[in-house]
């Protein structure tokens, strides 16, 4: 099923498949430095589903920006280059993860035109939230996700 999902994803012009958070990677590499940067909450989003779709794009001129996305200290998207083509990932968020989560967008580089900037779209069933972000080597933007009652 996983390979079929990947094939379907490639056919419609985006990458990646669903994953469950506990199977993700511990923070390694440059993203391991996330605690050394200031984290700035730029938006709070209330969600109702047990899975969310994350969609990443470069925001404006494609200049080589690369980000890692970290959910509650787990890398869920490692070192993803941003472009005008959507990068999509479905993440499962079981109730056992709690009702308040922090999604950090960690700049792995600044691209050729600082700062590192992009657009994150979070899809929660039929609800869609667009979050523009900017980060650099001193601060990382974060989205707070709160589960609806």
Predicted regions and their residues:
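Terminal leader/tail segments of proteins
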Residues: 1-71, 77-149
